[in-house]
């Protein structure tokens, strides 16, 4: 699924003409016939729901009989992994004037349709919507969500600047909510280019939705299933949104959208929280116990801040998005990590939570950073596309967050609290997005940091802590903001796995080398059913496991039951006890007035 993917922008294929000693020659670049009047139609109703599928049609006009080459994206921006959505396509067909057209495939996600002349052509297929993932599509008996990257084809080699119209067919009484711009008819939408049409996740079916104006922007909150997020819980989410959004807009001096839509799915079985950002919306899938939980607020804040940082303020390597291949960048720690810094900070600045919430979240990021060992932020940013198995596949989130935190303190200290990381974000946002959408380079990032820091060089910081692998200088930097880090050592029983959660439970994504699970034969891909007497289905289950075995000696035998394919497998493990260092970020009672001023400005803006 994450294998190297050939560039569909270049479209260069090697002709395998090696018979008789012939030398392989490159073929011409893939290029579709020109298309006009592109319309998409999406169907989700009771009939398609029975097969957990979404019906898709694409109609367009051709000028002649030249072949039309249509490609489906391989990934959704923000996910940084190749999902190859073409594998979920079934029943592909093409027709014109009521007659079937010939078609074949050029590669595994590009279809070649052969029109018989000028006129309207319609291609259709069914998309299997059974993947509970924020970058994919998922359906139940009366509800579905989809991402445009899953459903909408584009003409290969013709650029992505074409406008389009989207029509959604569904049952009478079922709702549609999306960030797309409404068209002239009900359930009809328009998009200025392909980037826009695929960046608008959509709910169809039965769900709750309401709206409010926040800081001059219409905000919609859509939640599935009906009735789950109601009353005080829904009011809490709205209060949090009212607090966080103005605090974010203040960093950039504007809200870049006319409307914003928060889409939330709470399945019956889901073990955590997963969300994905878009230009004027985001889609999240959550454990039901997280309704109105502070963790939910943190995730929502993260995705909303992305509407500025990465959807608009974006590394140059990601401008424009190329939907057919990976786009690695060394700057993902800025796009994701610094967003992780601002998400919790915005909740404090917006009055949603007290500073202690930010301290606790940051202490968790520090612990994750220290536990990961020596890994450079730039290296981790590049490696995310291959998902390293050493536990560092997402380290650029917490380590990038604390890098942003330290930079903010250092900029404030260098300028006597006259400037901050806010100035860096605002400067780059306006120069590399608003004035001309070029994206920012590494050089532009550090030049902006230098300017904000009053000309102070941050070359040493970059060399040691971003490109380098040195431990972060907590004891040198935190006191500048009247803060200090305290540690405590505990000993905890661990199973020895890295879990990921979905609607089936806790799946083993990787194993701790030489850990108890690896030694007993647990395999990547297994689903944990039970560990000792503890039923495992979500993150809280592991807290129960640790509590149950807290007083047991190392080496105590216990059984683990895993689901492996269609079979349940019982394995015998020996208890392993691991030393854990707990870290807390606290205010220094002996801090200077200058340090307190920096801390207060950081926490409350300014």
Task: Show which residues each predicted segment covers.
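Short, hydrophobic/aromatic-enriched beta-strand segments in well-ordered soluble domains
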Residues: 56-62, 72-74, 112-143, 164-172, ...
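Zn2+-dependent metallopeptidase catalytic core
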Residues: 81, 85-94, 150, 157, ...
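Early extracytoplasmic/domain-onset interaction patches
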Residues: 26-75
């Amino acid at each position: 699924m994450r294998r190297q993917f050939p560039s569909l922008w270049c479209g260069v294929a090697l002709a395998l003409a090696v018979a008789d000693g012939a030398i392989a020659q490159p073929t011409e670049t893939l290029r579709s016939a020109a298309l006009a009047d592109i319309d998409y139609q999406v169907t989700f109703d009771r009939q398609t729901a029975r097969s957990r599928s979404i019906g898709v049609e694409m109609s367009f006009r051709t000028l002649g009989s030249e072949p039309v080459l249509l490609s489906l994206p391989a990934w959704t921006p923000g996910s940084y992994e190749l999902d190859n959505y073409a594998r979920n396509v079934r029943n592909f067909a093409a027709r014109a004037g009521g007659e079937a057209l010939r078609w074949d495939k050029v590669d595994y996600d590009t279809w070649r349709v052969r029109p018989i002349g000028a006129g309207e052509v319609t291609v259709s297929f069914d998309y299997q919507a059974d993947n509970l993932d924020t970058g994919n599509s998922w359906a139940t008996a009366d509800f579905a969500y989809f991402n445009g990257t899953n459903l909408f084809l584009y003409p290969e080699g013709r650029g992505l600047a074409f406008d389009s119209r989207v029509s959604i067919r569904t049952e009478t009484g079922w709702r549609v909510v999306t960030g797309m711009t409404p068209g002239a008819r009900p359930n009809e939408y328009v998009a200025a280019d392909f980037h826009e049409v695929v960046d608008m996740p959509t709910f169809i079916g039965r769900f709750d939705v309401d709206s409010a104006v926040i800081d001059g922007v219409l905000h919609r909150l859509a939640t599935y299933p009906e009735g789950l997020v109601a009353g005080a819980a829904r009011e809490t989410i709205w209060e949090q949104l009212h607090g966080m959004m103005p605090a974010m807009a203040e960093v950039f001096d504007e809200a870049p959208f006319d409307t914003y839509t928060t889409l939330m799915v709470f399945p019956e079985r889901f073990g955590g929280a997963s969300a994905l950002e878009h230009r004027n919306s985001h889609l999240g899938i959550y454990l039901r116990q997280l309704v109105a939980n502070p963790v939910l607020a943190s995730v929502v804040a993260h995705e909303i801040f992305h509407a500025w940082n990465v959807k608009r303020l974006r590394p140059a390597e990601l401008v424009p998005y190329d939907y057919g291949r990976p786009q690695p960048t060394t700057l993902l720690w800025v796009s994701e990590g610094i967003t992780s810094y601002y998400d919790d900070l915005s909740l404090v600045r917006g009055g949603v939570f007290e500073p202690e919430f930010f301290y606790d979240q940051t202490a968790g990021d520090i612990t994750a950073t220290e536990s990961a060992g020596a890994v450079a932020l730039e290296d981790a940013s590049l490696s995310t596309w291959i998902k390293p198995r050493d536990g560092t596949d997402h380290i650029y989130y917490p380590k990038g967050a604390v890098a942003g935190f330290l930079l903010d303190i250092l900029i404030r200290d260098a300028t006597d609290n006259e400037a901050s990381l806010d100035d860096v974000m605002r400067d780059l946002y306006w120069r590399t997005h608003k004035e001309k959408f070029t994206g920012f380079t590494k050089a532009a990032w550090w030049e902006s940091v230098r300017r904000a820091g009053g000309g102070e060089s941050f070359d040493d910081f970059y060399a040691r802590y971003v490109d380098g692998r040195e431990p972060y200088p907590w004891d040198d930097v935190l006191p500048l903001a009247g803060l200090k880090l305290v540690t405590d050592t505990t000993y905890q029983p661990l199973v020895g796995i890295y879990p990921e959660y979905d609607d089936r439970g806790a799946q083993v994504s990787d194993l701790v080398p030489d850990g108890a699970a690896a030694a007993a034969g647990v395999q990547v891909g297994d689903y944990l059913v039970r560990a000792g007497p503890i039923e495992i289905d979500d993150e809280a289950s592991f807290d129960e496991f640790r509590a149950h075995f807290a007083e047991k000696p190392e080496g105590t035998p216990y059984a683990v039951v895993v689901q492996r394919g269609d079979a349940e497998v019982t394995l015998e493990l020996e208890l392993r006890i691991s030393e854990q260092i707990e870290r807390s970020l606290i205010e220094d009672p002996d801090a200077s007035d200058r340090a307190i001023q920096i801390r207060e400005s950081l926490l409350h803006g300014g």
